[in-house]
From Swiss-Prot:
Pathway annotation from the record: Protein modification; protein ubiquitination
PROSITE patterns referenced in this protein's UniProt entry, alphabetically: TRIAD, ZF_RING_1, ZF_RING_2
Gene: rnf144aa
Protein's recorded name: Probable E3 ubiquitin-protein ligase RNF144A-A
Organism of this sequence: Danio rerio
Region (TRIAD supradomain): 16-237
Binding residues annotated for Zn(2+) 3, in chain numbering: 143, 146, 151, 156
Compartment(s): Membrane
Functional summary from the UniProt entry: E3 ubiquitin-protein ligase which accepts ubiquitin from E2 ubiquitin-conjugating enzymes ube2l3 and ube2l6 in the form of a thioester and then directly transfers the ubiquitin to targeted substrates.
Name of the top EC class for this enzyme: transferase
Amino acid sequence: MTTARYRPTWDLALDPLVSCKLCLGEFPLEQMTTITQCQCVFCTMCLKQYVELLIKEGFETAISCPDSACPKRGHLQENEIECMVATEIMQRYRKLQFEKEVLLDPSRTWCPSSTCQAVCQLKESDTVLPQLVRCSVCTLEFCSACKASWHPDQDCQENVPITSFLPGESSSFFKADDDDAPIKRCPKCKVYIERDEGCAQMMCKNCKHAFCWYCLESLDDDFLLIHYDKGPCRNKLGHSRASVIWHRTQVVGIFAGFGLLLLVASPFLLLATPFVLCCKCKCSKGDDDPLPT
């Protein structure tokens, strides 16, 4: 049986509590973590949950200070992140870092084969022009620009849908997988996306493009997810009918609330417009008056 340790009053006075900007709670200094780059202080539990969420969702590799008003706009260093998270989460963080490095490096590209996913090196002198790339792992030969099979003396076919280069399609270098292939490419920016489980409505972390995982059709304007009510993707969203109805109710409610707010505010806007215009005209007239000599 454990008992609470008695601490004298003067000891408590010398151990002040520090406020966390995330949860607004107050904790002793030993339960707080200071970000080295900006010296902002948060409770260790909140900062740990914040870092883990960003890594699990894959939002960003440069994890910034959670304080939006941070004057130095600091970032957490890799050793600080490693002290907070579990080994498997840290491995995912390093994987995301590597993927971003390859994406931003013009001299490297990913092998387009869904069964390979190796990193291929381009010739440094011709990184801008389409060139033949040969994967050192699977020996696949493809075009560095369009990722299709190498086409010497032919231009890249810009009008060919990107879906023809994706797993599950009739491409010369992709295995004929089913619609549940774990890795596909964004139809807009061609970045590789891995889907573990969950909803079929995907959003590319690179270009923020929303699309259906199965048919790759754009969902940017489909706020009500009508796409999953018909066609080959019907009932493939991955959520129950009740949750879909609740989502649509929320979306309709938001639009209805915005419309109602605009309707209520419109008379006040109409009344205020003449006064605003008069004030602006008066100010501009005052600026045009010559200065007294």
